[in-house]
Amino acid sequence: MKKILITAPLRQDIYVFQAYQDALDRLEIPEGFEASRFFVVNGCDEVIPYIRDAEFVRVENEEEYSKTHNDHIWTMDLMWKMGDLRNRTIAEALNGGYDYWLSVDTDLILDPWTIYNLVQADKDIVSEIFWTQAPNGRYWCNAWMADQSAGMTEEWRKPGLYRVGMTGALMMVKRRVFEAGVSYDRIPNINTALRGEDRHFCVRAACAGFELWVDTHSPARHLYTRQLFEEYKAGR
């Protein structure tokens, strides 16, 4: 039996988190696989009573985090803190003997066939795509070819499996990638040129010889604002 750890740092609105868990409950698990959940609760103790069917640890949060009605507000310190929290989830996967680590940010609503499609892809590192509309109306996704966010393509709106340069937020990684030393540790000689822990992870993975891919058969839904959550609950 192959083991999958579904995991994420957790700092989220209760209602969004409940919708997130509902989507996890609907996931189709392939035959021969089993899935468990693990969260690192990051300064939002109010959500703890609502966690179900999951293990969790609680960490103190000394960094102020906020978001507007349009976007998250990220500082460099918050990004590196997020990297530390993601490393905590990797350690849980390694220590728990898991074969796959599936990181799913807690504002994402997964399609029921997400795990099935990611397992079928059979890649060391593969994400499932989701698209987000920025305040300026432009759409961006959680995969790109190079640098900060260059090389997104409309081709990825077609169902398929595509090689990419970088990805994150909704990503399945095989155990051997972590055993090779790939992590979310900050690369000390790359600073503002590549902002964000996902980018540093992808650079480390590429340097270790691993390819990165994105699957587009079952896009997730990104509820990163209250308005988007209300639209989702209204069935739009």
Enumerate the language-model features and the residues they cover.
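Active-site beta-to-alpha loop of glycosyltransferases that engages the nucleotide-sugar donor
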Residues: 3, 8-22, 43
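Conserved catalytic core of nucleotide-sugar-dependent glycosyltransferases
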Residues: 90, 108-187
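Cell-envelope/extracellular polymer assembly enzymes that use nucleotide-activated donors
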Residues: 3-7, 36, 200
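Short, acidic, metal-binding catalytic loop of nucleotide-sugar glycosyltransferases
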Residues: 19-34
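Short beta-strand-to-loop acidic/aromatic patch adjacent to the donor-nucleotide binding site
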Residues: 97-109
